[in-house]
Amino acid sequence: GAVWGAIPGLLKAFRNLNEMIIGILLNYVALLFMGYLYAGPLMEANIPQTAAIEPADRLSRILPPTRVHAGILIALAVLILIYYYLYNTASGFRLRVVGNNPVAALVNGLPVKRMTVISFVASGAISGLGGAVEVLGVSYRLMGGFGAGFGFDGVAIALIGQLNPIGTGFVAYLFAVLRVGANTMQVGAGIPSAIVDVVQAIIIIFAVAAMGLV
């Protein structure tokens, strides 16, 4: 994750390319490369997926018989650490300055390019940690469709959460409830799970409008 995150970071810092576009394009490259792995050298028998992770290596469930596992604790810990770093440390303040106004940061002598790359590397590492939690706590293997839509959901969640770690956490929980609820409604009531995409789109439109971006 850190290595993958460094690519848009370097392109943003030294070529001033749009990190959003580069990130989206790299998502497709990563998905195709992952597909090569679980359908090629890591394939289990003749099924396009990797072998299942041993039960002893999986994240334990903390609220049996539900599927809630220790990954939620990891997510909360990362959320708190990021918030503390950004809003209670000098380097976190400098990083926010670079993100909000790189020109002003450069004028004041901050190493904008270096901090930009570091922030992308850290972001990629956290994304990789999220993927590891998903594998170790939910799917237990790599298979087709893994991670599909996560990147776009992440962009929407960060936007609605106004790039604040705490706000992002609450919005992520809301989106998770919508996703799980949609699957339950489809099984129990026959309501198409795609309805959640409509609901999320409406939420995003209103959130962006409230921020004055449209």
Write out the residue ranges for each language-model feature.
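Cytosolic-side transmembrane-helix boundaries in multi-pass membrane proteins
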Residues: 107-114, 180-214
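Transmembrane helix-bundle core of multi-pass membrane transporters
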Residues: 19, 23-88, 141, 195
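Alpha-helical transmembrane segments of multi-pass membrane proteins, especially transporters
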Residues: 1, 19-27, 115-123, 145-149, ...
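Interhelical loop and adjacent transmembrane-helix boundary motif
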Residues: 133-200
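Transmembrane-helix boundary motif in ABC transporter permease subunits
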Residues: 1-17
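Helix-capping/transition residues at the boundaries of transmembrane alpha-helices
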Residues: 12-14, 86, 160
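Helix-loop-helix "hairpin" substructures at the membrane interface of multi-pass membrane proteins
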Residues: 3, 65-141, 165-166, 170
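Hydrophobic alpha-helical segments embedded in the membrane of multi-pass proteins
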Residues: 2-6, 25-28, 76, 128, ...
